[in-house]
Regions:
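Nucleotide/phosphate-binding sheet-loop regions of phosphoryl- and nucleotidyl-transfer enzymes
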Residues: 1-275
């Protein structure tokens, strides 16, 4: 019996299935995360879906290879163990980010979805654990905005009739609420305001895109994964590849990683460093 092809590479607790030299398979980001994990740097646990999956996805009429979903579920279970939380669990929920990762850097050309796993069942526990209702509803409205834009509109191939996409329309809803309240900054919005916005956003998404924002964590996850693969052939990415001479057949990896938050308060932040 032939050995099943490995499509998912874990990094957690100072160990990694991959190596820093495996950029062709894991993409630059995935290879870097694997190497940092091996070096003992405190990297939040996650896993990388290989560039091979992207290649097979497009070869097979945008269908995933056999065994991928089982490998993702197996890797997620290991991430849950490493983080002491469970994806979709109503008591100790794990949230993840879903990011692209080509072997050569393509900054801003492909898609990202953050806060994946926030649902009506996990929000109460996140509020209880963080003791910060405002942060949780801010994360939730960001998820709705990002997911509607990246997954439900762009990846679905929906072209806005008036040229204004769903993200622009949701931003207008937020700006209108700020004007009504006399606020100057997004940070002026209260927990109640953000909860109200999340409800408004979901209604707007349903009205414009004719679909409900998903309340199932795994539907959110696979929507995000698919959107990253779709973004490899998005207009921006295709144009960038032509300019930079990046071959189409390289494909992108997908990195699913435990969330790190930069919006929990004035002493919280995230960023990108270049060396």
């Amino acid at each position: 019996m032939s050995k099943k092809k490995k499509y998912v590479y874990l990094f957690a607790n100072g160990k990694a299935d991959g190596k820093g030299t495996w950029k062709e398979l894991l993409g630059g980001k995935g290879a870097g995360l694997a190497e940092m994990s091996r070096l003992g740097i405190p990297v939040p646990a996650g896993f990388t879906i290989t560039t091979d999956v992207c290649t097979e996805y497009y070869k097979n009429s945008r269908k995933y290879p056999a065994g991928l979903k089982e490998q993702v579920a197996h890797a997620m279970a290991k991430v849950e163990k490493a983080m002491g939380a469970e994806f979709g669990d109503p008591k100790r929920p794990l949230l993840v980010s879903v990011r692209s990762g080509a072997r050569q850097s393509m900054p801003g050309m492909m898609e990202t979805v953050l806060n994946v796993g926030l649902t009506s069942k996990t929000i109460p526990a996140m509020i209880e654990r963080s003791r910060n209702e405002r942060f949780v509803y801010d994360a939730y409205r960001r998820l709705i905005m990002m997911y509607a834009d990246v997954v439900m509109e762009k990846a679905a191939g929906i072209e806005p009739a008036d040229g204004h996409g769903i993200r622009h329309q949701l931003e207008q809803e937020m700006d209108q609420l700020k004007r009504q309240k006399g606020y100057q900054f997004d940070t002026d919005l209260t927990a109640g305001d953000l909860k109200h916005l999340a409800d408004l956003f979901k209604k707007k998404v349903k009205a414009v895109l004719k679909k409900d924002f998903p309340d199932d964590p795994y539907e959110q996850l696979w929507g995000g994964i698919g959107a990253v693969f779709q973004s490899w052939n998005g207009k921006r990415a295709v144009s960038y590849r032509k300019i930079e001479g990046i071959p189409e057949e390289w494909g992108t990896a997908v990195n699913v990683q435990s969330m790190v938050f930069g919006n929990t308060g004035s002493r919280s932040g995230t960023g990108v460093a270049f060396t």
